[in-house]
């Protein structure tokens, strides 16, 4: 997802950065600011930045430049109670990851994930490998890693 489709010039643009859009539900509507260079940050730093930009959105204190330049977006309906859904890609981004509500199934926790992606830019097999790697990284020790 370091790519984007240039509709006007029919080109594929390779990005040298990975900015993640985070969908934030506010009383003013949905806002999708970006966490810049997310691939080079520790999980603890991402968590702090997520809280900061979410608060800025809710208080209308965020600079509008924070809404541009995303590589992909992460959206969650878990807090509202949604499980599986099909998130819609925010052009010119090429993918969006939807996170549902954690549910308990047979004494195990399950986190529903839905990945939508632009097949013109992202190969379906690569998307499946991404989902498998994400699943592996969210394995048993994930909650422990977050608490460090």
Segments from the language model and where they lie:
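C-terminal catalytic/motor cores of large multi-domain enzyme assemblies
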Residues: 3-148
